[in-house]
Amino acid sequence: MAYVKEHAPSEVYHLTKKENLNSILEDGRIRRFGDTECWFCIDLQKMKAYMEQTVMCEGKPYYSVTGQLCRYPKFVPGDYVLLKLTPCRQEDNWYRWEQEIPAGSPAELVRAAHEFSLLKIGYRGDLAFHNAEAIDVPRFLTEGVTQGEPVHTSTELWDTLSRRIEDEMADYMHRLDLRTRDELIQTADEIDAMMTCDCELRLLGECLPREELVFLLEQDRPLEQMSKAWMEHRNVDLGETFQSLLTGLYAGQQHNMDMKM
């Protein structure tokens, strides 16, 4: 096989199992996982043609990254998600894999191999991305749906949350300035809880699990929500216990949602 240098695309499409989506968004990267490159298609027409010649061909043989002969399993569209991604950096690191065909091969085989090689493009390394959209695969295949739902990486979620926290804390400090000395003394525990939660959230940052970042962004005043819970549990230690408190709040919300269904 031979590699051909390609211009950096402005956006790419990547097919993956739904079960991988959360970890991909937490990571903010498409990983190579043992390969030299991670692979994409530059438009949906190429992606559909690529799928029709690979994952949609049940029983078709292929070689894995390790060189092992495998066969494609039964294709279940609902198990997959199609990601539209914008690469973070326009690096000169893109290649097309041109499949080599033995000399003397029929012209039809040579043409088919070349056309297949044009379907995908590889990024040499792990691709960091932003502005992701998740396209529903069943609807893409049956209805031609090309518009996806925006999905956010942990870094993007934390950037939004940190701005929310900063604004909320600034508003809180302004309101503290309006309190009398006696009111400040009476609300010392509340003030301590707000300061503690602000500090702990900033220390944890984007290391928080993605679902907990989403949970906090769903709250009108995330710092106030956390500080109230912290005051109820103020006898616990800092650090990991703060994380446990947040995890407990998230789990409680999920339990309440499950009970309503």
Question: Which residue stretches match the model-derived regions?
Answer:
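ADP-ribose/NAD+-binding catalytic cleft of ART/PARP-like enzymes
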Residues: M1-W39, E52-V55
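Non-Sec secretion/translocation targeting segments of pathogen effectors
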Residues: H14, Q254-M261
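Residues immediately flanking
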Residues: K18, I42-L44, L85-P87
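Surface-exposed flexible segments
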Residues: E19-T36, E91-A107, E240, S244
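Short, well-structured alpha-helical interface segments that form or flank functional binding sites
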Residues: T36-I42, Y80, A188-D192, T196
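Short active-site loop/helix that positions an aromatic residue
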Residues: L44-Y62
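Active-site and NAD+-binding cores of ADP-ribose-processing enzymes
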Residues: C57-T160
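Protein-protein interaction and targeting regions used for scaffolding, dimerization, and localization
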Residues: W158, S162-H255
